[in-house]
Amino acid sequence: MSTYTDENVPGRSGPTATTEADPRAVGKVRTEYSPAHDGDPDPGEIVWTWVPYEENDGRGKDRPVLVVAREPGGTFLAVQLSSKRHDGDREWVAIGSGPWDKSGRDSWVDVDRILRLHQRGMRREACALDRGRFNLVRKRLHERYGWT
């Protein structure tokens, strides 16, 4: 198992840095549920990566994200998770708890902010989200952006 510091967390910098993507400019997106226990991140899986703060000032945080789509160029689209409560907020989808949070706290997915990830910019230390909860997120992405 690798040990990471704030300086070498996958996705923080360089060509494999995690970046924010404009959901209306990414073109046609086909979300898919295809987790596979193959050591690679796949749509439907929760992985960890460096997520830049929205201020885009170089700061950020290593956090879990849900991979929702694979892009033709080999990158992935994902949405970030938070344990901060967002009940009643349409930009967030409640997905409950899972092994991605060692404290067992409930989580919410932010469908308002789309992240572009690179395979080498992620570390795979979480799990596959079950299809039912993934479909809740997929439905909200479809409503919001027309993604299939």
Predicted regions and their residues:
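C-terminal terminal-subdomain/extension
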Residues: 1-20, 97-148
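Terminal targeting signals and extreme-terminal segments of soluble enzymes
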Residues: 18-30
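Short alpha-helix capping/helix-loop boundary micro-motifs
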Residues: 30-36, 53
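Non-catalytic surface loops within mature trypsin-like serine protease
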Residues: 53, 83, 113-115
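Compact nucleic-acid interaction/catalytic patches
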Residues: 55-62, 67-101
